[in-house]
Amino acid sequence: MTTATSPTTAPAASFALALPAGWARLPARAEHERELTREVDRIVREALPDDLPRDSAEPLRRQLRRRLTDAVEEAGRAGANAVYLPASMDGFALPVSLSEAEVDDESETEPVRIVADLLTEAGQLDGLRDVDGAAAARTSATIASDQAEGSWERTWSKRVVYTVSVPHRPGRWVVLTWSAVYGDEPSERLADALVELFDAVMTTFRWTDVPGADPTPVELAVAAAEEAR
């Protein structure tokens, strides 16, 4: 379970999302630099434990720390509030990431109209979704890149975006972007499965800051987890 509160101009939207065990939320805003450093250090320790030979492991730690920090800071400059990454298992991490952002719409257009416009522009009229009572657009695209990654000479990214209106914060939208990278036929099948995983994760999305509403079981669980930290 992970929770998120946007550091954009208040009032912000808070929500809970159930991600697979081991995923880390890395804050991408400059004001949360210390928290980012703490999370990156934790990920590096788990990926490259202290019992590894220092001479060979330390350069890898520095490289991983730099790559993670640079990627998250770049996402922050692009407007993201946070980036979510899967845990590494036996030295392997799934080639997937999730970014979280919030945007404001100063027009008085109804959310359903905005969702319809987004889906029409994308040519994906079947992407209308209800996310915990909020109108949302699900859009997808495959992005090609000439940049090599590992053994792949060229890569593609299956990108799925949920643009969700915040029903209790007029004009506020939560944007969640899932990106699964692949470079050959077997990894493309994995990317397809990861897209299905994201759609399943989005069924767990719950608002946690609805004014006047009694605390939900999700909110109570989140509060208990925060107190236990």
List the model feature ranges, each with a label:
Residues W23, G123, W178-R229:
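Surface-exposed amphipathic alpha-helical segments
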Residues H168-V175:
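Short hydrophobic/glycine-rich mini-motifs in sensory/regulatory modules
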Residues T69-V166, T216-P217, A225-E227:
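Signature of long, low-cysteine stretches enriched in small and polar/charged residues
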Residues T2-L17, P111-R113, L190-V195:
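Short aromatic-glycine motifs in intrinsically disordered, low-complexity regions
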Residues A13-E31:
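Proline-anchored loop/turn motifs at beta-strand termini and strand-loop-strand connectors
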Residues A28, A101-E102, R206-V210:
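Short beta-strand-to-coil "C-cap" segments at the C-terminal boundary of structured domains/repeats
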